[in-house]
Amino acid sequence: SEKSAIFLILPEEDTTKNFMAGLMIQNLSRELFAVADENGGKLQNRAVLYCDEFGTMPPFDVLPLFSAGRSRRLTLVPIIQSLAQLEKNYGKEGSEIIQDNCQDTIFGGFAPNSQTAEVLSKALGNRTVLSGSVSRGKNDPSQSLQMMERPLLTPDELKSIPKGSFIVQK
């Protein structure tokens, strides 16, 4: 019941050891599932696995952790640079399952050619704004106002989010 933290730090320049992170997460989650099952299906203390650079790790059997972990008080927080990383490692279906099991998504900054910005823009939906124009003739000033729908944030607006700012999607 004592709280603790484990940090696994692997050198970025040597990817030959990346498989160890996946093995550790897989084995740790199996052990935590077993402990939860011995204690009525829930861990006494919530366990959270923060997986920075999750998208660069070799794929491992992570889907059960997403789908079965929450009810046992075990959460995996994947931190990725691009949704394309998930699709590359877990395929289209696996990527969708992982995304569907993430209750909250935090986005900050995008590469100029990022398809993730397109996906997020669509996911955020649209809003209705008042748009208008004024034109002036010699004796005929006219004004036109109309309600129109636009994305809440366009892909270009998402790509220009200032450093240190984030979009949180529930």
Stretch-by-stretch model annotation:
Residues 1-74, 89, 151-170:
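P-loop NTPase motor domains
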Residues 55, 82-84:
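Acidic, glycine-rich active-site loops and adjacent beta-strand->loop/helix elements
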Residues 75-81:
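Structural recognition of the conserved hydrophobic beta-strand(s) that form the central parallel beta-sheet
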Residues 3, 64-67, 85-170:
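P-loop NTPase motor core of the ASCE superfamily
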